[in-house]
Every structure is written in structure tokens, then in C-alpha cells.
Regions:
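Small/polar glycine-rich anion-binding or flexible loop at a beta-alpha turn
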Residues: 62-69, 99-107
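Hydrophobic alpha-helical scaffolding
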Residues: 11-14, 72, 112
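Surface-exposed helix-capping loop/turn segments at secondary-structure junctions
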Residues: 30-34, 53-60
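A short linear hydrophobic-aromatic micro-motif
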Residues: 55-59, 92-97
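Active-site C-terminal subdomain of aminotransferase-like
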Residues: 1-49
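A common structural junction motif
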Residues: 86-94, 127-131
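PLP-dependent enzyme catalytic core of the Aspartate aminotransferase-like
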Residues: 100, 104-131
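Conserved PLP-binding catalytic core of the aspartate aminotransferase-like
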Residues: 57-89
Length: 131
């Protein structure tokens, strides 16, 4: 109550988090939210097209997200080995499924600061590991 009367916070605020949020909000405003949504859709469309061509989609397309694509491992690859190889060679990670889906699916994120070129690059690296 006393700190509120002095227009102060009751505890020390997390300044790095405040600065990070400010930085990201500034970037979003500069790019424009319509452009952000368009970029995420383009990346999602790209990832889903790649997945359908090489594997399959885990969810029905009507439930597809423009932030993450879950790929159904229809080829029976060892997902963990591909993830490890891409991470070691390119310092980039993508994730496999959880629990029962660990080797049955893998996930490709396409949101935030990622660009369409980076999504295409990751998909190319995965393709290279599949040969």
C-alpha cells in the first residue's frame, strides 16, 4: 500500500523483461500486425505444403495453425536422429512429438521473428538428412 501511494512497485520489477517486451512491441508496430499475420500464414502454408508432399499432416487442415505445424511421420524415420543431425550441423532445433507421439510426429515452429527463408532453409536441411 505504501509503495502504491508513492507510485512505486511493491517489488523490484524485472527490467530485462520489460525492455524485451518493449523491443518486441516496437518491432511488431513497425512491421504492422497485418504483415505479421500474413508472414505467419505464408510460413505455415510453406511448412504444411512441405509436410503434405513428404509425410503427412498430423491434424486435419481445418485445425492447422500458422504458428506450428505437426508433421505425421508416415515414412517411419527415426525423428530423434534427424533432429540431432540438424541441430549439430546447423545449430537449429525442431521438436519431436510428446510421449506416445515422440517418433510418430515432429513439430516445425514458424512464428515470432522467423522468416520464410529460414523456414525453407530448415526444410531443406531436413530433406538433406532424409537422403
Amino acid at each position: 500500500v505504501k509503495s502504491n501511494e508513492k507510485s512505486q512497485t511493491p517489488t523490484t520489477p524485472s527490467i530485462p523483461h520489460i525492455m524485451a517486451v518493449n523491443y518486441q512491441c516496437t518491432k511488431l508496430v513497425k512491421e504492422g500486425m497485418e504483415n505479421v499475420w500474413k508472414r505467419h500464414k505464408e510460413m505455415g502454408d510453406c511448412a504444411r505444403a512441405w509436410a503434405k508432399d513428404r509425410f503427412g499432416l498430423f491434424c486435419e487442415e481445418q485445425y492447422a495453425s500458422n504458428t506450428l505445424t505437426t508433421v505425421k511421420n508416415t515414412r517411419g524415420i527415426v525423428v530423434g536422429d534427424v533432429i540431432k543431425a540438424v541441430q549439430q550441423k546447423h545449430n537449429t532445433a525442431f521438436g519431436n512429438g510428446y510421449k506416445d507421439l515422440k517418433e510418430k510426429t515432429f513439430r516445425i515452429a514458424h512464428m515470432g521473428d522467423i522468416t520464410i527463408d529460414e523456414v525453407k532453409e530448415l526444410l531443406g536441411w531436413i530433406d538433406a538428412e532424409l537422403k
